Regions:
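Active-site environment of divalent metal-dependent phosphoester hydrolases
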Residues: 12-17, 74-77, 106-110, 133-134, ...
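Catalytic pocket-lining loop regions of alpha/beta-barrel enzymes
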Residues: 124-125, 137-247
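A general structural detector for well-ordered alpha-helical segments in enzyme core domains, enriched
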Residues: 54-58, 83-90, 114-118, 142-146, ...
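Short, flexible/disordered intra-domain loops and linkers
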Residues: 41-44, 76-78, 164-174, 256-263
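Active-site gating/metal-coordination segments in enzymes
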Residues: 65-165, 169-171, 218
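The substrate-binding groove and active-site-proximal loops of carbohydrate-active enzymes
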Residues: 40-46, 129-137, 222
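Mid-to-C-terminal alpha-helical segments outside catalytic/metal-binding sites
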Residues: 2-9, 16-61, 65-66, 234, ...
Length: 296
């Protein structure tokens, strides 16, 4: 398989002090929701941790050229600004490897100023967003101002999507499908990325009354091996087209815990390629071309 560039469209990275003691960080920042997700209730948890050296080494080993650093949907607006500072440092430090997305909260002081500041620092999108965890909704006026900013900047916006039925886990918060359709209708030129296979939202594109409104909606595959059977990948491609699918791992999550001792990129890359029986054209698009095409 010969590709020009391979990009993981959905990763997370944390500062060294967070990796050293995530519980201390969560308690000091009042991030109870995040803490539920990253600390195991029993046994070895799914959450892995990776500093700069480890992440770059794993990317090199697994043949990943670049990674999008998604922000988190923090409950505390100061945590969003703090993460944006981390991302600003990291994309300045390793611009050839990392692409920064902005973490946003409706209660940040002057959120549009925060977005403009990060745009000037070289950020390329907003995400990962989950307004409902932050006590808001996508239809909130401040959220919509941020969405219009992204549209004008040519930025994609990544949303966490929770499937409406199925998995239950600590910290699960619903993400209404209606709101994503509404957003696509309100700002049709906004590039929207629905994470985690969109919680299977893309299958609504089989509805001819819905599909025309979703031309700028894309779907990343972050954490999908944890969620769905492997035939879902080819089915997604057949329904929406390979041009709308973005490979992402949710690194450093261990998304294939039965085979992964530590987080990596190659496990899911190989699974996707083999299970979906990707052509070279499909692989080139899904593993990098599609996300590149919607970055500013």
């Amino acid at each position: 398989m010969s590709l020009i560039v391979i990009i993981d469209g959905h990763t997370h990275r944390y500062a060294d002090e967070v990796i050293a003691d995530p519980v201390k960080f969560a308690l000091s920042q009042k991030e109870s929701h995040w803490l539920k997700l990253v600390t195991p209730t029993q046994g070895k948890g799914l959450q892995g941790w990776s500093d700069r050296k480890e992440m770059l080494s794993q990317m090199k080993t697994d043949g990943v050229d670049r990674a999008i650093l998604q922000g988190w949907y923090w409950e505390n607006p100061t945590s969003c600004v703090l993460q944006n500072e981390w991302h600003a440092k990291w994309i300045r430090q390793d611009p050839q490897n990392f692409i920064g997305f902005v973490s946003i909260h409706p209660s940040i002081k002057d959120p549009l100023d925060e977005l403009k500041r990060r745009q000037d620092q070289g950020f390329s999108g907003i995400g990962e967003c989950h307004p409902w965890v932050q006590g808001s909704t996508l239809r909130d006026e401040i959220w919509m101002q941020c969405m219009h900013f992204a549209e004008r900047a040519g930025w994609p916006v990544t949303f966490h999507v929770t499937e409406p039925v199925g998995h239950d886990y600590p910290g699960r918060v619903s993400t209404p499908f209606d709101d994503f359709l509404w957003l696509a209708q309100e700002i049709p030129t906004l590039k929207i990325i629905l994470a985690h296979a969109g919680g299977l939202f893309p299958f609504y594109e089989l509805n001819p009354k819905v599909r025309p409104d979703l031309q700028n909606v894309f779907y990343d595959l972050a954490a999908c091996p944890l969620l769905y059977e492997p035939q879902v990948y080819r089915q997604l491609i057949d329904v929406v087209g390979y041009e709308k699918i973005i490979w992402g791992t949710d690194y450093p999550l261990r998304i294939m815990p039965k085979t992964q001792e530590k987080p990596d990129f190659a496990s899911f890359k190989n699974l996707l390629h083999n299970e979906a029986k990707l052509s070279s054209k499909e692989a080139s698009a899904i593993f990098g071309g599609n996300i590149l095409s919607i970055l500013p």
